[in-house]
């Protein structure tokens, strides 16, 4: 009797086959049934909150990373409720598979409709945050996709507990077992198997640190929807409202320092810097923020530590802010072009023309005017949650919700036409 442990490739092939079968059912399923299953999954998360917290405690006990990463890993009752509420919100969204995207009639009478369609089988590779698996599963179900999850080893017990609770709800709703699956262990070979699963997985979405995303992009034989680091800037224009600038910047940097939507660099116009920069520094220092500043900023606030060569290319994910004084809007745009990651950029100004130039001049997935960069979030965009923030140009950009996990095809309706 052969008792050999199946290889990662064999496990992945089995999972992908089950996912493909489930996806075919999901694509044809009425929206009300998909939404009902999501609500059942959310209910089970609430019911099993104690088990999820116990699993999370096991992960936290063995975690040895920095405080910012520990905060990403941490679950509590409020965060579990937020996950469940996000799933309920996804269920309440319009059906991304409903209706036609476009329709037209050709001179020969053929009616052509462009209709939405699920992408297929999604592979989700993520680190640290246990909520990512729940969000990804919910967004995939809403959009008619099946998903295979592979979370980080540091959150293995939390991820598994969330998966078990959600799939209990899905089974109660009569969903195929292959709808949502999770890697059965923390074997890194499973990641390699996912990346090489051309023809089995239709899209890989990495969500995590720069090294993870770069590895996926480098090794994948499957299309990748990349989520780059958040080297986000808040630019205080010469015509900014000072009190608004103070409020927006404090939130953009310090609300949650460990998320990809946090501001990592302050750019401030030289015309307003002498009066406003000391107040901004004082506000942030009182909240526990540290700084790395260029020479022009240090000339105004001498106590600021000097920035090193790499500091303006660093995603801090912590209570640290790079600071630069720039000549004007053009200089700010130039700085962003050299150091940004195409994630989120914000301007604070009362000048509508300057704001319009900034919004058009930044090559970021999200550009903001008089708002905190931390609004770059699927929930805040009305998507219920997000599966990531796409910073590339294909297939979608910005927060990825259910509608962004669809493609389209064509339905052609005739009355017996033949082509001459």
Curated annotation (Swiss-Prot):
Its EC number is 1.2.1.41. InterPro entries: Ald_DH/histidinol_DH, Ald_DH_C, Ald_DH_N, Aldehyde_DH_dom, G-glutamylP_reductase_CS, Glu-5-SA_DH, GPR_dom. The keyword Cytoplasm applies. GO terms for molecular function: glutamate-5-semialdehyde dehydrogenase activity; NADP binding. Pathway: Amino-acid biosynthesis; L-proline biosynthesis; L-glutamate 5-semialdehyde from L-glutamate: step 2/2. Coiled coil: none annotated. It is an enzyme of class 1 (oxidoreductase). It is found in: Cytoplasm. It catalyses: L-glutamate 5-semialdehyde + phosphate + NADP(+) = L-glutamyl 5-phosphate + NADPH + H(+). Keywords: Amino-acid biosynthesis, Cytoplasm, NADP, Oxidoreductase, Proline biosynthesis. CDD domains: ALDH_F18-19_ProA-GPR. Its main location: cytoplasm. GO terms for cellular component: cytoplasm. Pfam families: Aldedh. GO terms for biological process: L-proline biosynthetic process. HAMAP family: ProA. Catalyzes the NADPH-dependent reduction of L-glutamate 5-phosphate into L-glutamate 5-semialdehyde and phosphate. The product spontaneously undergoes cyclization to form 1-pyrroline-5-carboxylate. Belongs to the gamma-glutamyl phosphate reductase family. This is Gamma-glutamyl phosphate reductase. The gene is proA.
């Amino acid at each position: 009797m052969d008792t050999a442990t199946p290889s990662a490739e064999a496990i992945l092939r089995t999972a992908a086959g089950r996912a493909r079968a489930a996806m075919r059912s999901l694509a044809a399923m009425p929206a009300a049934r998909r939404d009902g299953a999501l609500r059942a999954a959310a209910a089970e998360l609430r019911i099993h909150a104690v088990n999820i917290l116990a699993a999370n405690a096991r992960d936290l006990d063995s975690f040895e990373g920095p405080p910012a990463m520990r905060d990403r890993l941490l679950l509590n009752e409020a965060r579990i409720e937020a996950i469940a509420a996000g799933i309920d919100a996804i269920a309440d969204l319009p059906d991304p598979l409903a209706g036609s995207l476009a329709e037209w009639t050709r001179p020969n009478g053929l009616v052509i409709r462009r209709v939405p369609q699920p992408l297929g089988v999604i592979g989700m590779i993520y680190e640290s945050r246990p909520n990512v698996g729940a969000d990804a599963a919910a967004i995939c179900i809403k959009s008619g996709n099946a998903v295979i999850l592979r979370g980080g080893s540091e959150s293995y017990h939390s991820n598994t507990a969330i998966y078990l609770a959600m799939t209990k709800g899905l089974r109660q709703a009569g969903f195929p077992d292959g709808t949502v699956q999770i890697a059965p262990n923390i074997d890194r070979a499973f990641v390699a198997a996912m990346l090489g699963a051309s023809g089995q997985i239709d899209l890989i979405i990495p969500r995590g640190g720069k090294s993870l995303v770069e590895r996926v992009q480098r090794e994948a034989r499957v299309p990748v929807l990349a989520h780059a680091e958040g080297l986000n800037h808040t630019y205080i224009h010469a015509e900014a409202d000072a009190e608004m600038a103070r409020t927006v910047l404090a939130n953009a940097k310090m609300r949650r320092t460990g998320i990809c939507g946090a501001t990592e660099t302050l750019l401030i116009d030289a015309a307003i810097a002498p009066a406003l920069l000391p107040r901004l520094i004082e506000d942030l220092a009182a909240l526990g923020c540290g700084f790395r500043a260029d020479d022009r900023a240090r000339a105004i606030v001498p106590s600021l530590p000097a920035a090193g060569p790499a500091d303006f290319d660093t995603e801090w994910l912590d209570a640290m802010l790079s600071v630069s004084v720039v000549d004007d809007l053009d200089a700010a745009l130039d700085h962003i072009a050299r150091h940004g990651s195409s994630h989120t950029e914000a301007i604070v100004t009362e000048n509508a023309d300057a704001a319009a130039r900034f919004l058009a001049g930044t090559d970021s997935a999200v550009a903001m005017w008089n708002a905190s960069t931390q609004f770059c979030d699927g929930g805040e965009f009305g998507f219920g949650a997000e599966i990531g923030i796409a910073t590339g140009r294909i297939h979608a950009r910005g927060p990825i919700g259910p509608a962004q996990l669809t493609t389209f095809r064509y339905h052609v309706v005739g009355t017996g036409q033949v082509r001459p």
